[in-house]
Design a protein with these regions (language model features):
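Structural motif
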Residues: 3, 46, 118-119, 170-172, ...
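Conserved beta-sheet core of the metallophosphoesterase superfamily
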Residues: 77, 179-241
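Active-site metal-binding loops of divalent metal-dependent hydrolases
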Residues: 7-11, 51-54, 82-84, 111, ...
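Conserved catalytic scaffold of divalent metal-dependent phosphoesterases
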Residues: 9-11, 91-184
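Short amphipathic alpha-helix with an adjacent loop that forms part of the alpha/beta core around
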Residues: 38-39, 159-164, 238-241
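Short aromatic-enriched loop/helix-cap "lid" or pocket-rim segments at secondary-structure transitions
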Residues: 14-19, 90-92, 132-134, 186, ...
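N-terminal, positively charged/glycine-rich alpha-helical extensions of SAM-dependent methyltransferases
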Residues: 1-7
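Core catalytic region of metal-dependent phosphoesterases/phosphodiesterases
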Residues: 2, 15-115, 185-196, 221, ...
Length: 241
């Protein structure tokens, strides 16, 4: 069994929110996802999807997008992104999937899972700079950042419980937002990563930055971009430290 990651699928099965307007790389991106995903992911593998999964505004409207995701090879662990307005409680999401026969999707949000070579955990995170919030409206930056730091700590505390069973397994964090981007640093999130000695963190959210290195190090932590367009819509193998 292998572990992969790819964020920012931005699914729109009814094409009400086409991604084609964002450039040639996004043309027919759902077809690319289906082809490339199934080419590298086997049925026994797991793919982590850290947010921005469906453009739907309501959970009931997201069914076809989840059916598409469910049809792809492997198990999926999904996190929350800033565009996932359909997101609901864990119980409501699981009931919705169970009712509609969706069996390969589970939640990675304030919790943790153990795999053969690492323990994975994650949450959404938040914008690295207050000025970026224009994409979702007026919110209280400091309040939400602190809340997201608490959620990350909850997830890492669950991961630590699993790590107690095998001290050699590293903790790998999956966020939607990058804790570090260019000269901006989300110190609240970064401090939690240091507190739990995290050395590997994956993030999405950033689009069109195809020139940057896939992995960059900051304060001893490897930060790896896993946005779907950066990966050319091919899930990336997760390499633990």
């Amino acid at each position: 069994m292998s572990l992969f990651v790819m964020a920012d699928l931005h699914l729109s099965s009814d094409r009400s929110k086409s991604m084609d307007i964002f450039g040639a790389r996004w043309q027919d991106h759902m077809k690319k996802i289906e082809k490339n995903w199934n080419a590298v992911v086997s049925p026994e593998d797991t793919v982590i999807v850290p947010g921005d999964i469906s453009w739907s505004l309501r959970l009931e409207d997201s069914l076809e997008d989840f059916r598409f995701l469910d049809s792809l090879n492997g198990q999926k662990l999904i996190g929350k992104g800033n565009h996932d307005f359909w997101w609901s409680t864990h119980s409501k999401l699981r009931t919705f999937w169970e009712t509609n026969g969706i069996k390969s999707i589970n939640i990675l949000y304030n919790n943790a899972y153990r795999f053969d070579d690492c323990i994975v955990c994650g949450t959404r995170g938040w914008f690295v700079e207050e000025a970026q919030q224009h994409t979702i409206g007026e919110v209280e930056y400091a309040k939400i950042v602190n809340r997201e730091a608490i959620r990350l700590r909850l997830s890492l505390e669950e991961a630590k419980k699993l790590q107690d069973q095998d001290k050699n397994l590293p903790l790998v964090v999956f966020l939607h937002f990058p804790p570090v981007w260019n000269e901006f640093v989300c110190r609240e999130i970064l401090d939690v990563l240091h507190e739990f000695d995290v050395k590997s963190c994956y993030f999405g959210h950033i689009h069109g930055a195809y020139h940057i290195p896939r992995t960059q190090q900051f304060e001893g932590i490897d930060f790896t971009i896993c946005a779907a367009d950066y990966l050319n819509f091919t899930p990336l193998p997760v390499w633990s430290i």
